Amino acid sequence: SRGLGDVYKRQVQDALSAMRFELFPGMPEEEFLRLTGGGRVPSSVNVFLLKRGDGKIILVDAGNGGKRGGMLRKLEQSGVFPESVDFILLTHMHGDHIGGLLGKHGEAVFSRALVYVSMPEWEFWQNGTAGPQGKQVRKVLHAYGSRVRTFRFGEEVLPGIKALDASGHTYTRAYLFETDSLLIVGDLLHAAALQIPRPEVCTIYDMNPSGAVQARRRFYEFAASSPKPVAGMHLPYPGIGR
């Protein structure tokens, strides 16, 4: 844990993975091998824990859940139990970011937490045209019911935490949160080893590839002008760096 103004932060690794060449359409295999040095890209599914000076506990994203995710076990090992979490901020609503919100019977894992999602994201998943992934999203929205809150970009979601537009990865707006001393970014960076030197590299998960490329370039410029470290949902452990 490190000091973070009126909060401290902790990365919780929900799952560890390695990304294959086939996940990067359009990238020359020779360049992929050169940049990776071994044919696979280390990746991670991360959750970030923030604790404010007033004792309120905030999670940013919730990992995979189920057998694929280790978030709950690791949180409990550090003394943080689901019922003690006050707020959950979602970068977006893909399965590896919301799966941990649901128990095996579709119940809400976090019994008290308010869940914050951007208004464009909420509207996208509500319209019933989002395909199979929409089923899981609607289960989450149903399980948390009146505890779901929406926000718009540029707003202060919670005191000291602002939501910034990082449109591109999805057709809605995958985004980032800025705290007093940290930038928390969603899926603009799946594979740091490739996408930092080559922001034009996309994965099969980028629903809007051209938008994702533009968003990455904008984010790199923004991050380069900021003294704050970057925390990434898919950056390799420890998930925070410059």
Model-derived segments and spans:
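Conserved beta-strand hairpin/beta-sheet module of binuclear metal-dependent hydrolase folds
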Residues: 9-77, 175-188
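Active-site metal-binding motif and surrounding structural segment of the metallo-beta-lactamase
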Residues: 68-116
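Active-site glycine- and acidic-residue-rich loops that bind
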Residues: 162-175
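Short, well-ordered secondary-structure micro-motifs
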Residues: 22, 101, 126-129, 161, ...
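Short, small-residue-biased leader/transition segments that mark boundaries at the very start
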Residues: 2-8
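Active-site neighborhood of phospho(di)ester-bond hydrolases with catalytic His/Asp-centered motifs
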Residues: 59-62, 86-94, 116-118, 165-168, ...
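Metallo-beta-lactamase
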Residues: 109-165, 211-218, 224-227
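Cap/insert and terminal regions of metallo-dependent hydrolase folds
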Residues: 179-242
